[in-house]
């Protein structure tokens, strides 16, 4: 779906951050973690993050799920269970400073949105060390922006999916220098009525990125992982399933 002409670059204003964060729900811890394993891993700057592994330990394809704010990894648990049932090894984790509780413990450090790419890089490297040879990144809101930044310049990320990722948030920015260096297959998903303007950002990401890529603007007001539980949830989940099956989990993966 096309959009009107994109306005100029988004200003780095506190109001932009507050509007974006207020549009994100806190995420529910009610989702089952049956069959998953709590783990932790360090970042390059020495912060230990809390996470959880879902899916078969011998899977050759994996997925890292990066959460939106002010939610935590529990917002991804339903999708993690769904992907695990499809045969993927899935890692959810909490960005530094986030603590949903439970047997997984808390991520260390102070909350810092600008450290999201550092945290996600550590999560990606951890999952690859766990066994999967092909690992995709899926991020909601700021997790999506971080996913684009982490995938840029790396040849070991065959697929990236963003749900309502902003182009700019505080000091994080996914501009042309980032987007043109992502070799993996990119799927940008956003709701047309998202009050944070995610549809405009998704169109921008699509316009600036090389192939393979796809833009999906759905008729919804939901933001981030809320797209998976909203009126377009089944459609969004199917988009993710097909993208991963096409670019991450080919029969010849080994």
Regions found by a protein language model. Give the residues of each.
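Primarily recognizes the serine-hydrolase "nucleophile elbow" in alpha/beta-hydrolase
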Residues: 122-183
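Short beta-strand element of the alpha/beta-hydrolase
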Residues: 60-68
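Short beta-strand/loop motif that positions the catalytic acidic residue
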Residues: 182, 188-190
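N-terminal cap/lid segment of alpha/beta-hydrolase-fold proteins
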Residues: 28-55
């Amino acid at each position: 779906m096309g959009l009107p002409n994109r306005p100029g670059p988004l200003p780095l204003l506190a109001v932009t951050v507050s509007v974006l964060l207020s549009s994100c729900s806190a995420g529910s811890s009610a989702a089952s973690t049956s069959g998953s394993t709590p783990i932790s891993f360090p970042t390059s700057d020495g912060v230990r993050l809390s996470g959880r592994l879902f899916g078969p330990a011998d899977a050759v394809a994996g997925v890292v799920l990066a959460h939106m704010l002010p939610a935590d990894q529990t917002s991804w648990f339903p999708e993690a269970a769904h992907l695990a049932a499809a045969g993927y090894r899935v890692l959810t984790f909490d960005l530094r400073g986030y603590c949903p509780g439970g047997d997984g413990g808390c991520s260390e450090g102070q909350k810092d949105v600008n450290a999201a790419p550092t945290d996600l890089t550590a999560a990606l490297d951890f999952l690859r060390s766990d066994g999967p040879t092909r690992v995709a990144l899926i991020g909601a809101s700021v997790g999506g922006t971080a996913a684009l930044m982490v995938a840029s310049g790396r040849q070991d990320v065959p697929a990236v999916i963003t749900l309502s990722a902003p182009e700019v948030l505080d000091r994080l920015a996914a501009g042309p220098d980032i987007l043109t260096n992502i070799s993996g297959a990119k799927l940008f998903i956003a709701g047309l009525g998202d009050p944070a303007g995610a549809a405009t950002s998704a169109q921008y990401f699509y316009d600036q990125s090389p192939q393979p890529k796809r833009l999906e603007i759905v008729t919804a007001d939901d933001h981030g992982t809320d797209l998976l539980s909203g009126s377009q949830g089944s459609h969004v989940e199917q988009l993710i399933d097909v993208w991963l099956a096409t670019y991450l989990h080919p029969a010849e993966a080994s």
